[in-house]
Amino acid sequence: MDENKKRALSAALSQIEKQFGKGSVMRMGDRVIEAVEVIPTGSLMLDIALGIGGLPKGRVVEIYGPESSGKTTLTLQAIAQCQKNGGTAAFIDAEHALDPIYAAKLGVNVDDLLLSQPDTGEQALEIADMLVRSGSVDIVVVDSVAALTPKAEIEGEMGDQLPGLQARLMSQALRKLTGNIKRSNTLVVFINQLRMKIGVMMPGQSPEVTTGGNALKFYASVRLDIRRIGAIKKGDEIIGNQTKIKVVKNKLAPPFKQVVTEILYGEGISREGELIDMGVEAKLVDKAGAWYSYGDERIGQGKDNARTYLRDNPQVATRLEAELREKFQPAEAPREAGDDEDKE
């Protein structure tokens, strides 16, 4: 750059700093690029698929899927992990359907959980914004976007047609929220539902669409599609769901990774089941017929017995998890991801 341009740039930068404050514009090389802070999801498989070890703080995350697919379970497990690490969590229950007994079973400290059950969508998003701006909450979950009913709709008649009202509400709220989320380093998770598009579809195009317009798709740094793909049985009794989670969008690591995990009724995501499946894949756990072995020790005949063994011997499970993290999770992934994101 020639001297005249340098002087002009220097004058412009000093004018900007004078008008808008120090640090309002800076060279990327002047600050240290730090690793992205994350909150673990409670699923080792998903943490690894996300490429950064969990859900990123200071970002918007969307989790969507059909009914009873495990959306709320996944967010409650993330809340439990956040609380275990000393963080503060808030749950904005627009659906008015949170079960505190189930949340406690998943490891959530219900006494410390901040809960709001707002009357309108505007109230829900205003509460979320105030919690984010406080800078003292680590994770805010909004359950769900579909239940964020605009005030005009609540005050109107049952059959009133108010097209695009919810989409406008979400678009306005996200414009306001994103800057505050980044500044306070809060993770905001929106749970969303699926609807079917009515009308003629193009071949190969999905008829499914998420509620609340397109704004959330753009503002979200991570989007997760979660679906039930089968049942887990113990004899004739169904004890849980086999669940597929796909990383549909990821601004911090390569997207489109997918994992198949198990959600057990009353327990949530089966940590021990994941350790066994990943251990077999990584050849750390040996599977001979129905028997599973880890090291020199047989840990059970059949997956259910192996799962019980790991639950009863937490030191073995912890050792296996440490080996799997070392094998699957590159140590420098978060730093590179943060670096790439900031260069965009």
From Swiss-Prot:
Residues 323-337 have a biased composition (Basic and acidic residues). GO terms for cellular component: cytosol. ATP binds at G65, P66, E67, S68, S69, G70, K71, T72. Keywords: ATP-binding, Cytoplasm, DNA damage, DNA recombination, DNA repair, DNA-binding, Nucleotide-binding, SOS response. Can catalyze the hydrolysis of ATP in the presence of single-stranded DNA, the ATP-dependent uptake of single-stranded DNA by duplex DNA, and the ATP-dependent hybridization of homologous single-stranded DNAs. It interacts with LexA causing its activation and leading to its autocatalytic cleavage. Gene3D superfamilies: P-loop containing nucleotide triphosphate hydrolases. This is Protein RecA. Its main location: cytoplasm. It comes from Xanthomonas euvesicatoria pv. vesicatoria (strain 85-10). SMART domains: AAA. It is found in: Cytoplasm. The keyword DNA damage applies. It comes from the Bacteria.
